[in-house]
Amino acid sequence: MVSVNSSHCFYNDSFKYTLYGCMFSMVFVLGLISNCVAIYIFICVLKVRNETTTYMINLAMSDLLFVFTLPFRIFYFTTRNWPFGDLLCKISVMLFYTNMYGSILFLTCISVDRFLAIVYPFKSKTLRTKRNAKIVCTGVWLTVIGGSAPAVFVQSTHSQGNNASEACFENFPEATWKTYLSRIVIFIEIVGFFIPLILNVTCSSMVLKTLTKPVTLSRSKINKTKVLKMIFVHLIIFCFCFVPYNINLILYSLVRTQTFVNCSVVAAVRTMYPITLCIAVSNCCFDPIVYYFTSDTIQNSIKMKNWSVRRSDFRFSEVHGAENFIQHNLQTLKSKIFDNESAA
């Protein structure tokens, strides 16, 4: 049992070790498979790549980089010891924030790109290019790495109590929260969450408004249904994965800086923190769903793959059937010849 003292409030948070171990194991398996398949499709299957594909490739790479660090986290939360050194601890922490806010920003890029394509299809042609998409992706990487870097400087391994085990990902001192981390939280919440949230909701609303205009009613009903599904899936995944954690992170920083001192509030916030963090980490498994609903090219490629497999199976069965038919006729002919020779 682990009891933590936050000023004068005592609470138990030992459940987080089991929770993290189980959740990270599941995310590692599902995230590794789904994102490897996604990158394979992007690189080896897709013949035509557009600006949306560029954003999705970068999102998949971000997810995969984080997934590769999960075995170290799983080992730590299972054994409660970090034997991998201070540098790997820092890298793991940095990749966590890089992945989370990189995912948020890349999903926002996809949302803005869809908004421009549907609301301003002609005016946005000069903006929606692969070259500009690569520039935007470079800007996103620089932003999330720059925003995550300060956390690396304050994160380090330390000994736990009287035993020889090393700790990583554990609580920072209140002094560190008051001097550094509270400012980092303000920056990443504004740049990495609230602005993207506003952009996602605004862009999705504008797209829905455009689709309901009389001018667009003549569009194919199937295409409009696809866009509506795309928006619905996109917003559900965004809100489910990122809203709980980022709202709780604000409250958590207020608790750690002792702005909130009520013990019931402190216990509730610190209990919800590992739960919302696990939900946020699950975005690695849900992002491939966004790829499928966002890109017609991916859907068509998967359908073509399935069709080619079925067609090859059909051709094989045809050839195999023809061979059996020929062999049967030959056997019948041989039998007749043998019977005639015997009769003679």
Swiss-Prot record:
Annotated signal peptide: none
Sites where a glycan is attached: 5
GO cellular component: intracellular membrane-bounded organelle; plasma membrane
Record localization: Cell membrane
Tissue-level expression: Expressed ubiquitously, including in skin and hair follicle cells. Detected in both Henle's and Huxley's layers of the inner root sheath of the hair follicle and in suprabasal layers of the epidermis (at protein level). Expressed at low levels in peripheral blood leukocytes.
Pfam families in alphabetical order: 7tm_1
Cytoplasmic face residues: 47-55, 113-133, 210-227, 293-344
TM stretches of this protein: 20-46, 56-79, 93-112, 134-154, 182-209, 228-253, 273-292
Membrane topology: Multi-pass membrane protein
Disulfide bonds: 89-168
Protein name: Lysophosphatidic acid receptor 6
Organism whose genome encodes this protein: Homo sapiens
Higher taxonomy: Eukaryota, Metazoa, Chordata, Craniata, Vertebrata
